[in-house]
Amino acid sequence: DTLSLHDALPIYTFFTPFRNEIVPAYKTFQTEVNKWMQVYVEGKYVMFPLEKHWPDANSTLRITYGQLEGSAPTDGMRYTEHTTLDGIVAKYNTGNPDFELLPRMLDLHAAKNYGPYAQGDELWVCFTGSNHTTGGNSGSPVLDENGYLMGLNFDRSWESTMSDYLFDPNRCRNIVVDIRYVLWVMDIYSGAKHLVDEMTLMKE
């Protein structure tokens, strides 16, 4: 009786047939697709031996390279290579509820309390690079030339959404959250310095 009154029961009842019937059928179908995909790819090599054939990198380790740089995708428009906490506060000041901030964030910004994570008098939040990324790269580490963590990739610019099919190094940019901002949120904003103390921070 208690279970029948649970709010989640209708959802469970709805998804049970899906799990028991649709999921197994989908897995069978996907196995068949994978089998014939191998035949298709082999056929392409035979029919078009001089063409470039791109590998399927899904579920594999990938590496890409690029530079930290902005872009000018259209005439009269230019994106700088980084954003700062100033921009977050500027969006908050528009009154749009999507950009709501807690008072502590505003206080730390007003005091420019950026700790050791500032670059000059700014706290970088995100930066862009000319790395060729794709769907599924969110969370991928972005490393400098020495292998030190610079940030975490999480998106592409709007003008880069076609890069799975055509990569334009002058237009396509991946978007990365700066690891210094992540550390600042942990250490200064959230007061979790004990977590940062467990890490080895590399400083130039």
Model-derived segments and their meaning:
Residues 12, 53, 136, 168, ...:
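Hydrophobic alpha-helical scaffolding
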Residues 2-3, 7-9:
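Short, small-residue-biased leader/transition segments that mark boundaries at the very start
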Residues 132-153:
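Catalytic nucleophile loop of clan PA
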Residues 28, 50, 191-195:
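Intrinsically disordered or highly flexible coil/loop and linker segments, enriched in small
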